[in-house]
């Protein structure tokens, strides 16, 4: 399980680096959605299954609005991809800087695999976050409805703004 969490952590860092070196806003939105999914996967792996699901749904709704806006406002006929020379060079520079920072802070290159970082007990898939479900629906249910309604209206605002005068 720790190897899986380590793999998800590496994927999270790589997705953030993909966002930082995005050649086109479309790929930037895609990498943000992927990083949100990987981050919620880490939360689920650590036992927060309901929290990971709620965060993923709210984050995915917000990112769909942002992704729709960037796709509508910045459409290019031939967008740059991640295999272009400048993008690969920027990504290589970021990987090198990350390696230097890692070496300076930790004095050696140690991946940390095999250490017991968390006391997960029996390694349950379903964690203790189900205790907060009743509290979420009792006190925070209207906040979820309100947030969903705002995201729903934002989609229509983005579509109206990007419709243009055709």
UniProtKB/Swiss-Prot annotation:
Q: How does it sit in the membrane?
A: Multi-pass membrane protein
Any single Gene Ontology cellular-component annotation: mitochondrial inner membrane
Q: Which reaction does it catalyse?
A: a ubiquinone + NADH + 5 H(+)(in) = a ubiquinol + NAD(+) + 4 H(+)(out)
Which residues are listed as membrane-spanning? 1-21, 26-46, 47-67, 86-106, 139-159
Q: Which superkingdom, per the lineage?
A: Eukaryota
Pfam families annotated for this entry? Oxidored_q3
Q: What is this protein called?
A: NADH-ubiquinone oxidoreductase chain 6
Starting at the broadest rank, the lineage of the source organism is:
Eukaryota, Metazoa, Chordata, Craniata, Vertebrata
């Amino acid at each position: 399980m720790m190897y899986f969490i380590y793999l998800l952590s590496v994927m999270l860092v790589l997705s953030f680096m993909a966002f930082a070196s995005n050649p086109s806003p479309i790929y930037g939105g895609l990498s943000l959605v992927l990083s949100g999914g990987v981050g919620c996967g880490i939360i689920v792996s650590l036992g927060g299954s309901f929290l990971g699901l709620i965060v993923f749904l709210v984050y995915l709704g917000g990112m769909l609005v942002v992704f729709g806006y960037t796709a509508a406002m910045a459409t290019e006929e031939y967008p740059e991809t991640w295999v272009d020379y400048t993008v690969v060079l920027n990504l290589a520079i970021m990987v090198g800087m990350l390696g230097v920072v890692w070496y300076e802070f930790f004095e050696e290159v140690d991946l940390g695999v095999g250490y017991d970082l968390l006391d997960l007990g029996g390694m349950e898939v379903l964690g203790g976050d189900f205790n907060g479900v009743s509290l979420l629906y009792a006190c925070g249910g209207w906040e979820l409805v309100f947030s969903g309604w705002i995201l729903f209206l934002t989609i229509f605002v983005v579509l109206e703004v990007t419709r243009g005068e055709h």
